[in-house]
Amino acid sequence: MTASAPEAPLLRIDAVNKNFGGFVALDNINVEIRKGERFGLIGPNGSGKTTLVNCISGALRPNKGAIVFAGVDITLLPANQRSHRGIARSFQIPRPFRSMTVLENLMVALDFAAHRHLLETEAHRRDSAMSILTRIGLASKAHTATGTLTQVELRKMELARAMATGPKLLISDEAMAGLSTSEVDEVLDLLLSLGSEDIAIIMIEHIMQAVMRFSERVMCLDAGKIIAIGAPGEVMANPRVQEAYLGT
């Protein structure tokens, strides 16, 4: 009996380099991420984390190497085309339309994604928006002005807008920064529930307890290079990680 071939990775980063003048921000990055994988990305400030996810999302283009998503080389594609193919990103500082309600904010994101999801009518998009808000625990805030939301509600709103595009890969950039312990748990539980839906998630986070609880694998960058990758416990026990990231 012939063994089945392993499933192709959802995302493949092949020998990616990114320079800013003479500064090497990323140095020969090679990594694969599976469909539905929960992947933690850590490292000290200036290690290359943001540059890497900017290259993945399309905000930057690498100087060398390739980025392959769902079997397609997207290295040269602009950010909007990557979004339509299934890459979404939430940011540390939410930037909603504060004069709009929570529901209206989500409708804007769904309008952008409409041609992918065949959400042909406003009623269909509204139903989809309410379904997302229910899933993330903001249904009761649907008609609330976004400018009145708390920090944790804004973070959930940011994740909801990312989810509205129907991503295969979600990049969560410091979604828990500045939150209380209980609020961190809320957002973490939400991300874990999204991961159970076969959405791959790259989490950039400085809260180590959250990274350990969330991630199936963790990668640590330092000075633009991968210094460790593997199970969370193994990475955190790595002396190079402790020296570079934890300062021990």
Regions found by a protein language model. Give the residues of each.
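Glycine-rich phosphate-binding loops of nucleotide-dependent enzymes
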Residues: 2-248
